[in-house]
């Protein structure tokens, strides 16, 4: 069984369906409310576990009900949560999504995801160094991603970086990642002076 460590975001998605978006100062009635598990990191962990991998999740949650919901969901999917840190006086990351008029508007609150730092990675290193693959995304601080990529490269641990959401990453350490999975928009952000064809070559 492949051992995968996912280092990344844990969110709850709060989705409101409405006929239109409210104007500034306006209150309107919505149609439906959905609360779902999210975060690119946690989503990757659940997907990998459901495909049969042995998965460990590394990240941060707040000391709140949403954090507990995330922990429960990960455990229900047989994911190791030993290296998820509960951060006092911090909210769990959330995405507030309005679906209206055929489109969506999203406000993301990083919350505890912003607390995923080098110490969180170091605490989980015993699991990371034994992994067949480490998966990372851009929903945690960029300096932490750089630290993960550099340290894993030095230890010959394979890293898959999903550079979403798009960000300006330093090519010097970006090239140390074993795999990068950008879409076309993210590829342009990573290599702004090259065409897609030039980058792939």
Question: Which residues make up each language-model segment?
Answer:
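Glycine-rich phosphate/adenosyl-contacting loop at the front of the ribokinase-like
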Residues: 1-60, 65-69, 75-79
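Residues that scaffold the ATP/ADP-binding catalytic core of kinase and kinase-like folds
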Residues: 15, 107, 189-190
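Glycine- and other small-residue-rich loops at beta-strand/loop junctions that grip anionic moieties
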Residues: 59, 137-138, 162
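A glycine-rich helix N-cap at a beta->alpha junction
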Residues: 73-89
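Short gly/ser/thr-rich secondary-structure transition/capping motifs
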Residues: 78, 114-119, 159-165
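Conserved phosphate-binding/catalytic loop of the ribokinase/pfkB sugar-kinase fold
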Residues: 86-87, 97-133, 138
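Conserved phosphate/ATP/ADP-binding segment of small-molecule kinases
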Residues: 149-201
